[in-house]
Amino acid sequence: MGAPTLPPAWQPFLKDHRISTFKNWPFLEGCACTPERMAEAGFIHCPTENEPDLAQCFFCFKELEGWEPDDDPIEEHKKHSSGCAFLSVKKQFEELTLGEFLKLDRERAKNKIAKETNNKKKEFEETAKKVRRAIEQLAAMD
């Protein structure tokens, strides 16, 4: 019987899992932002057609793109999301106590809810603008 695996929601806490997301990452050897260093800084690679180097912190959900070979992932993370609790964790995942892990997971869940709420708010605001324009166009017809 093999070692138990973590539920998918917790796998990003593992550095090896984060490294595995960096397929087709443009910066490998001789660069500051290698997959290993990106993963150490908490990033996962989530490329899109228009943003092939898009990376997101699995913890605070901050997305960064436009990476340069000499960008330091930790410094970029601190610069763009200084309040990310992952940056202050001094232990490897495997060294955390259950209490420490659950506290981190609760913080991550709050971050995820905040990100999703913000996305829904933006989506609603965009829809509201379109509806307002349509109403104004209808009113102008009279």
Curated annotation (Swiss-Prot):
State the post-translational modifications: Ubiquitinated by the Cul9-RING ubiquitin-protein ligase complex, leading to its degradation. Ubiquitination is required for centrosomal targeting. Deubiquitinated by USP35 or USP38; leading to stabilization.
For the keyword Protein transport, the answer is no
User: Changing D70A: what effect?
Assistant: No change. Loss of interaction with AURKB
Species of origin reads: Homo sapiens
Compartments annotated for it: namely: Cytoplasm; Nucleus; Chromosome; Chromosome, Centromere
User: Which residues are Zn(2+)-binding?
Assistant: C57, C60, H77, C84
The entry's stated outcome for K79R is: Increases ubiquitination and blocks dissociation from centromeres
Q: Where are the BIR repeats?
A: 18-88
Q: Which residues carry this modification: Phosphothreonine?
A: T34, T48, T117
| Comment on protein domains | The BIR repeat is necessary and sufficient for LAMTOR5 binding.
Alphabetized UniProt keyword annotations: Acetylation, Apoptosis, Cell cycle, Cell division, Centromere, Chromosome, Chromosome partition, Cytoplasm, Cytoskeleton, Host-virus interaction, Kinetochore, Metal-binding, Microtubule, Mitosis, Nucleus, Phosphoprotein, Protease inhibitor, Repressor, Thiol protease inhibitor, Transcription, Transcription regulation, Ubl conjugation, Zinc
Query: Any idea what this protein is called?
Result: Baculoviral IAP repeat-containing protein 5
